[in-house]
């Protein structure tokens, strides 16, 4: 969608018309799930076609609650910020950053270097956002 909700909507609509057997669409841009949900609703496919993606809770609360989107994921920005600050502190203190480093933040307790990299760390700090928890996240 190139980070464009209208493009996500138009593309999803075209795909769903051309390939009616499609059961789900996963978006990677925060604009994909809302655009895809709009196409699903417009084509009368709510409850028949699944969509999920990334997105902010407050901006997507309605489409989660009405079932247009079942799940969104993202990193908690506060936790990600604390993890980055922890990593920066370790580096500034001269600590060696090794595979498995614990940054002391939930989801960032066992960081691993991305395949083939000694600079990019990956953790498990994903949040799963559903209609059941969307209002409790505060952002």
Language model: regions and residue ranges:
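Hydrophobic alpha-helical
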Residues: 1-63
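Residue-level recognition of short, well-ordered coil/turn positions
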Residues: 20, 45, 68, 95-96
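Structural signal for conserved beta-strand scaffold positions within catalytic alpha/beta enzyme cores
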Residues: 53, 73-74, 130
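Hinge/cleft segment of the Venus flytrap/periplasmic-binding protein
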Residues: 87-139
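Conserved beta-strand segments of alpha/beta enzyme cores
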Residues: 50, 70-71, 127
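Hydrophobic alpha-helical segments within soluble ligand-binding/sensing domains
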Residues: 5-9, 56-60, 76-96
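Short glycine-centered helix-capping/turn motifs at secondary-structure transition points
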Residues: 43-44, 67, 137-138
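Short beta-strand elements at the ligand-binding edges of bilobed clamshell
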Residues: 66-78
């Amino acid at each position: 969608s190139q980070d464009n909700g209208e493009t996500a909507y138009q593309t999803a609509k075209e795909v769903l018309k051309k390939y009616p057997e499609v059961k789900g669409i996963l978006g990677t841009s925060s604009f994909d799930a809302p655009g895809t949900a709009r196409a699903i609703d417009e084509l009368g496919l709510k409850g028949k076609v699944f969509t999920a993606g990334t997105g902010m809770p407050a901006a997507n609360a309605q489409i989660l609650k009405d079932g247009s989107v079942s799940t969104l994921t993202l990193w908690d920005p506060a936790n990600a910020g604390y993890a980055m600050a922890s990593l920066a502190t370790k580096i500034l203190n001269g600590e060696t950053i090794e595979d498995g480093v614990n940054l002391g933040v939930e989801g960032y307790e066992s960081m691993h270097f991305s395949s083939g990299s000694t600079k990019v760390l990956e953790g498990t700090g994903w949040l799963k956002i559903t209609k059941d928890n969307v209002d409790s996240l505060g952002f």
